[in-house]
Amino acid sequence: VLHNPLHFDRYRQLGTTTPRDYAALFARIAKGELVSREASAEMLAILRQQHYNTMLTHDFPQYYLDCEETGAPELIWVASKSGSMNACRNDGGIVHTPYGEYVIVLMNKDFHDIIEYNEHPAMVYGARVSRMILDQVLACEGRLSLS
């Protein structure tokens, strides 16, 4: 039973965004420019607790992400927000590395399989792209040029 159903015919723009807008939002949060620095830090802390970040982190080397056994700080952490609806799978966020942070946004649509699972083609594709970007950032020690 839905107590507050969404009537999509009334909300045609619900959930409408672009990768550029989503990336700009994360960049402003990372810089503390979206709201106050304190509120931005709280937002980052919440986004770091996101459990549904498979598209961004699935192919990352586990030793970068999990330092629970040693008590050492994580070498890489991700503050992200994912979303999906029907044939769309999206994820975006801030990836912190020893060489600095970068923003990544992956948006996929028009997949025939609308079921949510980690080996969904959109998740596999996104994880590979995310890993390629991480590898480049680490190989260049954070010195990437867009020129």
PLM region descriptions:
Residues 11-147:
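Structured C-terminal helix/loop/strand segments within mature extracytoplasmic catalytic/sensor domains
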Residues 1-9, 21:
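Acidic/His-rich structured neighborhood in mature extracellular/periplasmic domains
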